Amino acid sequence: MKFFLDTANVAAIKAINELGVVDGVTTNPTIISREGRDFETVIKEICDIVDGPISAEVTGLTADAMVEEARSIAKWHDNVVVKIPMTTEGLKATNILSKEGIKTNVTLIFTVSQGLMAMKAGATYISPFIGRLEDIGTDAYQLISDLREIIDLYDFQAEIIAASIRTTAHVEAVAKLGAHIATIPDPLFAKMTQHPLTTNGLKTFMEDWASFKK
């Protein structure tokens, strides 16, 4: 399984990348806006840090606008993946871009039908949202399981990016269900390394070693 960082904070990306567990980065207009910096500059800086797919999202709403923007974004770096919203216009754009060899990440997927349509259109990645589905009482884990089953059954080349990850339990569950990738907010990476028994165990080891060395 691959781990992507769901942030555009360059300092956080640098720090977490040193752990050796980051395979890529995802961003969206909200995440970019939080940084208050030029979109292109931020994406290029991220590409210089992480050697893996870096998702940058279009903001156009028509297929023509998305394609035009995507072509420009794709030129920023070889690792850039263009994020496209799951709409009819987004599907049109994804189809065009896939034929041009531009990698796409179709986002805001909440149903099996949406995921299937995105894969048929040629998406490189599909991003079903875990937390947001749970917010409305829908079984997000079943969606991941169903999408993975369809990919394996029909040999689609698209990979599942489990998005809207909020807890370590989310990461663990989607890993077991076969999501190819989990995109994780930077604060959650630290939580994934921690457990009280680990902390207490290390404390005991150090205390015992200090007593032994006296």
Swiss-Prot record:
It catalyses: D-sedoheptulose 7-phosphate + D-glyceraldehyde 3-phosphate = D-erythrose 4-phosphate + beta-D-fructose 6-phosphate. One of its GO terms (biological process) is pentose-phosphate shunt. Keywords: Cytoplasm, Pentose shunt, Schiff base, Transferase. It comes from Streptococcus pyogenes serotype M1. PANTHER family: TRANSALDOLASE. The lineage of its organism: Bacteria, Bacillati, Bacillota, Bacilli, Lactobacillales. GO terms for cellular component: cytoplasm. It holds the Pfam family TAL_FSA. Signal peptide: none annotated. Transaldolase is important for the balance of metabolites in the pentose-phosphate pathway. InterPro entries: Aldolase_TIM (IPR013785), TAL/FSA (IPR001585), Transaldolase_3B (IPR022999), Transaldolase_3B/F6P_aldolase (IPR004731), Transaldolase_AS (IPR018225), TSA/FSA_arc/bac (IPR033919). Its main location: cytoplasm. Its EC number is 2.2.1.2. It is an enzyme of class 2 (transferase). It is found in: Cytoplasm. One of its GO terms (molecular function) is aldehyde-lyase activity. This is Probable transaldolase. Belongs to the transaldolase family. Type 3B subfamily. The active site is at K83. It comes from the Bacteria. The keyword GTP-binding does not apply.
